[in-house]
């Protein structure tokens, strides 16, 4: 039996944050460490923030995965907010009625809730990568997200 895994590299871009934004996700499926399928996804928004684009990239990438997928899925992002939210802060936010420790509401609650929902039943690992540091997969989605943001009229 082949060992299957899925990687999702994501990035968001925002010109004049807040402002025009773009997102990108590269979804790759591997069988025994050989890439067997790849999908590049991207989109844009006329008025948004970099955090919303980072989250949208992950949401759209995960949205390509079937709900009954058994493979290990690793999401790579250079967004410390996204990785920290998904690996550390979410349980407290949910327990505190979507409020931060400061008492202020969690921003982008709609996207956090959508990310929780899309991950349900999946084996998802969240991994931070340093942006603009020579990681070829991160550079790929960074360029696509920037191009998508630049296309917004």
Where are these regions (language model features)?
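RNase H-like nuclease fold core
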Residues: 1-52, 56, 60-67, 71, ...
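RNase H catalytic domain
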Residues: 13-20, 59-140, 144, 149
């Amino acid at each position: 039996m082949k060992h299957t895994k899925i990687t999702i590299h994501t990035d968001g871009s925002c010109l004049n944050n807040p402002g025009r934004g773009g997102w990108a996700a590269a979804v790759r499926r591997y069988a025994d460490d050989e890439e067997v399928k790849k999908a590049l996804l991207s989109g844009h928004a006329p008025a948004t923030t970099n955090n919303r684009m980072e989250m949208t990239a992950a949401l759209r990438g995960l949205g390509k995965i079937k709900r009954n997928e058994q493979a290990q899925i690793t999401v790579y992002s250079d967004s410390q907010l996204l990785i920290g939210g998904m690996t550390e802060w979410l349980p407290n936010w949910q327990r505190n009625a979507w409020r931060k420790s400061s008492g202020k509401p969690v921003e982008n609650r709609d996207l956090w809730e959508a990310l929780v929902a899309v991950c349900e039943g999946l084996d998802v690992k969240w991994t931070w990568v340093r942006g603009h540091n020579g990681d070829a997969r991160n550079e790929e989605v960074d360029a696509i997200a920037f191009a998508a943001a630049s296309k917004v009229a």
